[in-house]
Amino acid sequence: EQEKCDKIYANKILKLPDKEKNNVGFTCTGLYWDKEEEYFFIGNAGKYKPNDKTFQASIEIVEKDFSIIKGDIPCYLKFENMRDIQGVTKSIDGTIWLCSYGENKVRHIDEKGNEIGYFDIKEPSGIANDSRSNTLWILTNNYLYNCSYDGVVQKTVKIHIKGQDQLFLDEKNDLIYFSAGADYHGDSYIYTVDLKTNRAKPLYVLKDSYAIEGITIVDDVLYVLNDGYYHDAETSVNQVNIYFLNKIQTKENYQ
């Protein structure tokens, strides 16, 4: 049953910067804002289209204004069984955790992409580091888990929303935000989970994010990645949709 929530439109939409191919950006997945370094870490699934032969999954390090790729971590060169990459996050020590969905693993790497460790978890998509407890929040197809860094599950919340995917943790308000939607020609959703009650509820209907992927909130601004080119979605562009949460647009009115 769909609770009432705001239907919102992006205040700003930016194309993702190009990698090997011109004018298509890249197939974006997880999104993490590194506030120390002031740039975004973005998962790149490593295929432009579903029928490309092999995955070349990497993490792209992208300028705050999404203008250029500053650097990358080519995960596929280190992990030969790796297929796509989904969520990415960093812990306080600067090391990186990522969801290797096709391998059913959460991988732990350094900033050069070298392996530190991994643990097994079925179908991990979203991940967020919790600096309050030095643990990880991981979203799968059926559950939200809180895990220690060695993969021991400390808390399980059953969540099953169609197309649930990526996570953002708001430590201050003890809330998890997650993206959901797999229509590609219709609405996508942002849900919250109140970690005090473990209750999930829809917060926003995103009217113009057709191929929703990673999400993050920085200074009251919601960033939503869309890999529309890969999915041939209603808007078939790899882009970031930017929503000003203190100036919510409830009808089309692009800047």
Regions found by a protein language model. Give the residues of each.
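Structural motif
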Residues: 49-61, 104-108, 143-147, 185-191, ...
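Blade-level signature of beta-propeller repeat domains, shared across WD40, Kelch, NHL, RCC1
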Residues: 128, 213-255
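Loop/turn-rich, solvent-exposed surfaces of beta-rich toroidal or solenoidal domains
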Residues: 78-104, 161-192
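Surface loop/turn motifs at the tips and blade-to-blade linkers of beta-strand repeat domains
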Residues: 14-24, 73-81, 118-122, 157-162, ...
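Short loop/turn segments immediately following the C-termini of beta-strands
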Residues: 44-47, 101-102, 141, 181-183, ...
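Conserved beta-propeller blade signature
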Residues: 39-42, 96-98, 135-138, 175-178, ...
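Short loop/turn segments that connect beta-strands within beta-propeller blades
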Residues: 2, 63-67, 109-114, 148-152, ...
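Repeated scaffold domains used in trafficking and secretory/extracellular systems
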Residues: 23-32, 81-88, 122-131, 161-170, ...
